[in-house]
């Protein structure tokens, strides 16, 4: 069962952690972020289908879906002005979930090595991924971790990590590349869970 959904930096959602139960109803005023949460969940599900980069492109690119408010809301509250600012930190969109058995985190950003004249300088890419066991992500529960093109899996000895790949393309997820039930069942389980999520934009409540 899913316990938690976390979203940081997506549209009107600066940083939320949403606890889930058997049935969770999200309510709020217009503009409070309900639609943003729904769309972020669809993006997260696309990670399991290997389609998250294409989905971001169809939304207008990563910069079109990022949180546009101030990086430091506390300072904005003190001044009484809440408005967008020039970014001083790396572009980042983070999403993830935690459940009884496995959890997953993905961090999407922009290339830092492509020059400004590159045609791919604004293309979104996967910066970081983590697959962990149980409802809480920590070093001791991490099974697979990816930083840019480098992927590691927890060593069978229980100490440290073993290299899985040092050349994973930035547009590919570990879930699309290595989720083989025989070799990496934990990746296959997370991938299949995301693939099995279903989304309905509307449904009858009187039937």
Where do the PLM segments sit?
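N-terminal pre-Walker A segment at the start of P-loop NTPase domains
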Residues: 1-14
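Hydrophobic anchor at the beta1->P-loop junction of P-loop NTPases
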Residues: 26
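The conserved Walker
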Residues: 30
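Conserved lysine of the Walker
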Residues: 34
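Electropositive, glycine-dotted interaction segments
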Residues: 92-207
């Amino acid at each position: 069962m899913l316990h938690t959904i976390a979203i940081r930096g997506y549209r009107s959602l600066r940083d939320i952690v949403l606890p889930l139960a058997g049935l969770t109803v999200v309510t709020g005023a217009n503009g409070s972020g309900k639609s943003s949460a729904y769309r972020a969940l669809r993006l997260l599900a696309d990670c399991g289908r290997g389609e998250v980069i294409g989905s971001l492109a169809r939304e207008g690119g990563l910069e079109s879906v990022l949180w546009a408010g101030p990086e430091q809301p506390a300072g904005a509250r003190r001044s009484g002005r809440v408005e967008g600012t020039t970014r001083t930190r790396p572009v980042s969109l983070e999403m993830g979930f935690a459940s009884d058995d496995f959890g997953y985190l993905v961090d999407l950003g922009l290339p830092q090595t492509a020059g400004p004249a590159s045609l791919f300088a604004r293309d979104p890419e996967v910066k970081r991924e983590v697959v962990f066991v149980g409802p809480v992500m920590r070093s001791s529960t991490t099974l697979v971790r990816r930083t840019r093109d480098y992927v590691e899996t927890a060593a069978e000895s229980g100490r440290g990590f073993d290299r899985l790949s040092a050349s994973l393309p930035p547009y590919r997820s570990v879930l699309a590349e290595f989720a083989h039930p025989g070799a990496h069942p934990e990746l296959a389980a997370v991938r299949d869970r995301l693939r099995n999520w279903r989304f309905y934009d509307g449904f009858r409540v009187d039937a």
